[in-house]
Amino acid sequence: AYESWERRQDQALRHATVLNDAKKDNNHIGAIQWCMTDYATHRDFGSGDRICYHGVMDSFRNPKDAAYFWGSQQEKDQVIHVSSSMDIGDYNGGIRGKVWIFTNADSVDVYKNNKKITTLSSSPYSALSHGPIPFSDTIGNLLETEEGFPKKKADIIKESLNAAVEYGFQNLPKKYLLKLAYIMIRYKMSFKDGVRLFEKYVSGWGGKGEEWKFQGIWNNKEGKSVTLSHSSKLHLEIQRDTTTLFEGNGYDETLIRIKVLDENNNLAPYAQLPVSIKTSGSIENAGFDLLTL
């Protein structure tokens, strides 16, 4: 998909909002989304490339965040998808803010560098069986386990650091400024100490690349998971719907997907490499002969 991650995430949340509202007012028998895929359009509509990016999948039938949201509303197959790469360079000021998890898991255990920091399950989309789950607390229990802080001290510091993520240090509401003052007096901490904790547990600046694991839990058992880290090894993956085509009164087709994935089998979104496709024998390419991933 060509849209930014912000737009793909926002699109998925708008789908969730509409379906949630339709279910909770008891006046709708169903809801139909627009639409399945991005599509070509005329010059007076769509984006500058004359493509309408309304689809929950792109023009090549590759799923966006919204497709994973809809997929999470069923019970047959396990679904877990994180709306972020967790790379701080994708965010203004390196602050991730709120990340969303689209899943039909009962809960999600979150690990940072192989250490469990929290378990998530609640969603603001209360009318949905499996509403999107927000995640913004990248600190979890680490102030207790890593810094050795008592729980009361850890909780108030964590609350203040997370508030700095939401509002920025320059725009902190008065109540958080008062809490920071209390922390500095009560625990004899300096502003420099706060900056160190913020950089270590929130922004990640100057530290070793982080690895995040989102482990889905179904019926008290681990199922599918998503692991996100700084990629260093890419590989090519080719998938096809079928290996056999049948000749009949018409013609048969199969869909072939070409992906560049990282070592955790996540898409490499910046690997926009050219691909040339050639066929031989009694088959023909029905798509583009030259395209970018």
Write out the residue ranges for each language-model feature.
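Short, well-ordered beta-strand segments
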Residues: 54, 115-119, 271-284, 288-290
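Edge beta-strands of extracellular beta-sandwich domains
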Residues: 119, 220-237
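Beta-strand-rich structural segments
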Residues: 99-103, 252-269
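Short, aromatic- and glycine-rich surface loops/edge beta-strands on solvent-exposed regions
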Residues: 144-159, 203-221, 293
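Low-complexity "stalk/linker" and mucin-like segments enriched in Ser/Thr/Pro/Ala/Gly
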Residues: 125-139, 239, 281-293
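Extended substrate-binding grooves/exosites of carbohydrate-active enzymes
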Residues: 1-195
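Short, solvent-exposed loop/linker segments at the N-terminal edge
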Residues: 88-94, 243-254
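Extracellular Ig-like/FN3 beta-sandwich strand-entry sites
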Residues: 207-211, 251-253, 272
